[in-house]
Regions:
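Collagenous Gly-X-Y triple-helix signature in extracellular proteins
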Residues: 1-177
Length: 177
């Protein structure tokens, strides 16, 4: 396993940091499997398979689950949190209150508390994090695949001898294209 290189996006006054892996480490987990479902909560981070996969035993179901009637399952036999971090490393990761505001008119999802989470639409356009403030292609949003990530079915494209993968955002919204 290759070491993980982290990009520090923000350091808070309480010495906590928001970090992003420079490479795509794993894949093959969809946001939610039923893309044909038109209920607004099907695009909520709080009810997503990928949230459960990322947080594993640390996953706490959303209060909204009573309304949505969704049973969230992790489609893999392991979670990212338990596989990527040792017990010591995991104890250093604190839970964060996660804002799940929407974009492009979709219904916003409820706030969650998570140790591992995807960036939001606003995060991916935040110039303080080193991104450009638009939806155009931006080299700072490119993420190269690890060998393991590539083996997990991440959708990718090749430039030269490098494979770059696409990554999810947690913000509910309509697709661009």
């Amino acid at each position: 396993m290759e070491p993980v290189l982290w990009r520090v996006l923000e350091v808070s006054g309480d010495k906590t940091a928001l970090m992003l892996s420079e490479k795509i480490l794993d894949g093959g987990v969809s946001f939610n499997p039923d893309y044909s479902n038109t209920d607004p909560y099907y695009c909520w981070w709080s009810e997503s398979q990928i949230r459960k996969f990322l947080n594993g035993k640390e996953y706490v179901g959303s209060v909204s689950a009573d309304v949505t009637k969704i049973t969230v399952r992790n489609p893999k036999t392991y979670s990212f949190y338990e596989k990527a971090f040792s017990a010591g490393e995991g104890s250093g990761i604190i839970k964060a209150d996660v804002d799940n505001s929407s974009t492009r008119g979709a219904a916003p999802g409820p706030k969650t508390t998570d140790k591992i989470f995807l960036l939001s639409y606003a995060d991916a356009k935040n110039t303080a994090y080193g991104f450009v403030n638009n939806e155009n292609s931006d080299p700072s949003r490119k993420a190269e695949l690890t060998g393991y990530g590539a083996s997990q079915g991440v959708i990718s494209n090749t430039e030269g001898n490098k494979k770059y993968g696409y990554w999810w955002l947690r913000s509910p919204g309509n697709s661009v294209g």
